[in-house]
Amino acid sequence: MQLDNILSQLFENQALTKAESQYFFEQVIQGNVSNEQLAGALIALKVRGETIEEIAGAVEAAFANATAFPAPDYAFADIVGTGGDGQNTINISTASAIVAATLGYKVAKHGSRSVSSKTGASDVLSALGINVTISPQTARQALDENNLCFLFAPLYHAGFKHAVPVRQTLKTRTLFNILGPLVNPAHAKRQLLGVYSPEVLKIYAETVRTLNHQHSIVVYGSGLDEVAVHGETLVAEIEDDKIHYFSLIPEDFGVQRHSIEALRGGEPTENAEKITVLLQGKGEAAHIDAVAVNTAMLMRTFGERDLKANVQRVKDLLRTDKAYQTLQNLAQYQ
């Protein structure tokens, strides 16, 4: 296979096979593709729209070149969004992961520094005193003992660094936004995946189905890559190799509506302060409800289907400081 041929195909608006995509992204990960070539390829993919085969090929390339994580044999999940929704909200997925872990669900959260928003998952966790660069063995220990670990993407997918200058220069969503959530190094088979557009929802669901997940849910929340408390959430639930599409509104979770402005965040320190207050049992109503609906949906991947009951469990927890204890315990792993 030749890099030049693949680039020519892309520039002529032809889709790549899964094998061609895997080859191309392995070349990217190994540093064999120039910034100019990569920028051209990513834009060509974006303008045409990435196919399931192209995304799946990139996922395979990432896994084939990733640092291994000692995956457990017990059930665990991941909650992660593509980012790139441009809304700069507080880190709802990160807070939800901490809450779910406190309720007894094991979560291996995959994430990185922000590339296209103000504050990524690792930015806010660092501000909360968490060492995001612990070894895979230590992270596994945290998951075993504390129900929660954070897997810092650059540590496991070192080759992605070759794409960072291009991503930062382009300042637009690319296949890498789509890729990140799908390449959890623990190979999570249960995931709550947030996407940045309704168009990506279907292609994401189809891609997840090819990756043999046990029970994963893809959501798009009226402009957010999360379950929304300000409007409708489009849902694709992937279970037993079937995809079920439906939509939910805040009332389906038993919560009231809040404006998206009430969820706005900022720099890592600001988001960290808001999350700390929330985990200590003193959170703002909008923050509590946003975390409750997302945690409720994550619980569903473990078979807890009653969303209203799940929300109530979260709200009861967030009247205490137990979730803050989970965060403090996580900080002990260095």
Swiss-Prot record:
<comment type="function">
    <text>Catalyzes the transfer of the phosphoribosyl group of 5-phosphorylribose-1-pyrophosphate (PRPP) to anthranilate to yield N-(5'-phosphoribosyl)-anthranilate (PRA).</text>
</comment>
<feature type="binding site">
    <location>
        <position position="89"/>
    </location>
    <ligand>
        <name>5-phospho-alpha-D-ribose 1-diphosphate</name>
    </ligand>
</feature>
<dbReference type="InterPro" id="IPR035902">
    <property type="entry name" value="Nuc_phospho_transferase"/>
</dbReference>
<feature type="binding site">
    <location>
        <begin position="109"/>
        <end position="117"/>
    </location>
    <ligand>
        <name>5-phospho-alpha-D-ribose 1-diphosphate</name>
    </ligand>
</feature>
<feature type="binding site">
    <location>
        <begin position="84"/>
        <end position="85"/>
    </location>
    <ligand>
        <name>5-phospho-alpha-D-ribose 1-diphosphate</name>
    </ligand>
</feature>
<feature type="binding site">
    <location>
        <position position="121"/>
    </location>
    <ligand>
        <name>5-phospho-alpha-D-ribose 1-diphosphate</name>
    </ligand>
</feature>
<comment type="subunit">
    <text>Homodimer.</text>
</comment>
<protein>
    <recommendedName>
        <fullName>Anthranilate phosphoribosyltransferase</fullName>
        <ecNumber>2.4.2.18</ecNumber>
    </recommendedName>
</protein>
<feature type="binding site">
    <location>
        <position position="226"/>
    </location>
    <ligand>
        <name>Mg(2+) 2</name>
    </ligand>
</feature>
<feature type="binding site">
    <location>
        <position position="81"/>
    </location>
    <ligand>
        <name>anthranilate 1</name>
    </ligand>
</feature>
<keyword id="KW-0479">Metal-binding</keyword>
<keyword id="KW-0822">Tryptophan biosynthesis</keyword>
<dbReference type="GO" id="GO:0000162">
    <property type="term" value="P:L-tryptophan biosynthetic process"/>
</dbReference>
<feature type="binding site">
    <location>
        <position position="226"/>
    </location>
    <ligand>
        <name>Mg(2+) 1</name>
    </ligand>
</feature>
<dbReference type="Pfam" id="PF00591">
    <property type="entry name" value="Glycos_transf_3"/>
</dbReference>
<comment type="similarity">
    <text>Belongs to the anthranilate phosphoribosyltransferase family.</text>
</comment>
<dbReference type="GO" id="GO:0004048">
    <property type="term" value="F:anthranilate phosphoribosyltransferase activity"/>
</dbReference>
<dbReference type="Pfam" id="PF02885">
    <property type="entry name" value="Glycos_trans_3N"/>
</dbReference>
<feature type="binding site">
    <location>
        <position position="81"/>
    </location>
    <ligand>
        <name>5-phospho-alpha-D-ribose 1-diphosphate</name>
    </ligand>
</feature>
<keyword id="KW-0808">Transferase</keyword>
<keyword id="KW-0460">Magnesium</keyword>
<dbReference type="InterPro" id="IPR017459">
    <property type="entry name" value="Glycosyl_Trfase_fam3_N_dom"/>
</dbReference>
<comment type="pathway">
    <text>Amino-acid biosynthesis; L-tryptophan biosynthesis; L-tryptophan from chorismate: step 2/5.</text>
</comment>
<feature type="binding site">
    <location>
        <begin position="91"/>
        <end position="94"/>
    </location>
    <ligand>
        <name>5-phospho-alpha-D-ribose 1-diphosphate</name>
    </ligand>
</feature>
<keyword id="KW-0028">Amino-acid biosynthesis</keyword>
<dbReference type="GO" id="GO:0005829">
    <property type="term" value="C:cytosol"/>
</dbReference>
<dbReference type="InterPro" id="IPR005940">
    <property type="entry name" value="Anthranilate_Pribosyl_Tfrase"/>
</dbReference>
<keyword id="KW-0057">Aromatic amino acid biosynthesis</keyword>
<keyword id="KW-0328">Glycosyltransferase</keyword>
<dbReference type="InterPro" id="IPR000312">
    <property type="entry name" value="Glycosyl_Trfase_fam3"/>
</dbReference>
<feature type="binding site">
    <location>
        <position position="93"/>
    </location>
    <ligand>
        <name>Mg(2+) 1</name>
    </ligand>
</feature>
<feature type="binding site">
    <location>
        <position position="167"/>
    </location>
    <ligand>
        <name>anthranilate 2</name>
    </ligand>
</feature>
<feature type="binding site">
    <location>
        <position position="225"/>
    </location>
    <ligand>
        <name>Mg(2+) 2</name>
    </ligand>
</feature>
<dbReference type="GO" id="GO:0000287">
    <property type="term" value="F:magnesium ion binding"/>
</dbReference>
<dbReference type="InterPro" id="IPR036320">
    <property type="entry name" value="Glycosyl_Trfase_fam3_N_dom_sf"/>
</dbReference>
